[in-house]
Structures are given as structure tokens and as C-alpha cells.
């Protein structure tokens, strides 16, 4: 777990629980920055069907804030950029929309 220490982001959910994620990438799309996260519990379980979380980075009073993205097209475009960066590597992530 030490090798991920620099890439770990801990967020608090709506119920006040802390959840740790590995930050896989930062993506710029349409002038906005996004982070792509993978829950650490998924890594520890070696879950082959783990889903990434994409959040938009916003600046609020000089502080970086992560905001959920509601627009499906925006999410898909950011995910495609992220996925294209890993095409040549052994990185098997999928978008949940691909299964529907």
C-alpha cells in the first residue's frame, strides 16, 4: 500500500464515512480539470469489474473541491480521454454504460 501513498485521496460521503481512493489520472476536458479515482477497497479485493469515479475539480476560495459530474456526455468524454491514455498498457477498466 505504501507505493500508492502519494496518490491516495480520502473523501467523505453524504453519510460522513471516509472513503479512500487511488487517484489514477487528472484529465483536462473543455477547459475543466477532472480526477479519475478508483476506490482502494476495489484494489484490495482485486475486483476486475471495479468502476472508476470521475469528479470535476473546482476552485473555491483558493481551495480545490471535487464535484460530481451529472452530465452523461461529459462523463463519457472524460472517461474516453482517460481510457485512451491506457490503451497500450495492461489496464482493463470499463464504463458502466458499456454493459447496459
Curated annotation (Swiss-Prot):
Pfam families: DUF1292
Entry's family note: Belongs to the UPF0473 family.
HAMAP family (alphabetical): UPF0473 (MF_01448)
Record protein name field: UPF0473 protein Csac_1599
Organism whose genome encodes this protein: Caldicellulosiruptor saccharolyticus (strain ATCC 43494 / DSM 8903 / Tp8T 6331)
Amino acid at each position: 500500500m505504501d507505493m500508492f501513498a502519494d496518490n491516495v485521496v480520502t473523501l467523505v460521503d453524504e453519510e460522513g464515512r471516509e472513503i479512500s481512493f487511488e487517484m489514477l489520472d487528472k484529465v483536462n476536458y473543455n477547459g475543466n480539470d477532472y480526477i479519475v479515482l478508483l476506490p482502494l477497497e476495489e484494489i484490495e479485493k482485486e475486483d476486475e469489474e471495479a468502476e472508476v469515479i470521475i469528479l470535476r475539480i473546482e476552485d473555491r476560495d483558493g481551495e480545490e473541491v471535487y464535484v460530481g459530474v451529472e452530465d452523461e456526455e461529459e462523463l463519457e468524454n472524460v472517461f474516453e480521454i482517460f481510457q485512451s491514455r491506457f490503451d497500450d498498457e495492461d489496464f482493463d477498466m470499463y464504463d458502466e454504460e458499456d454493459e447496459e
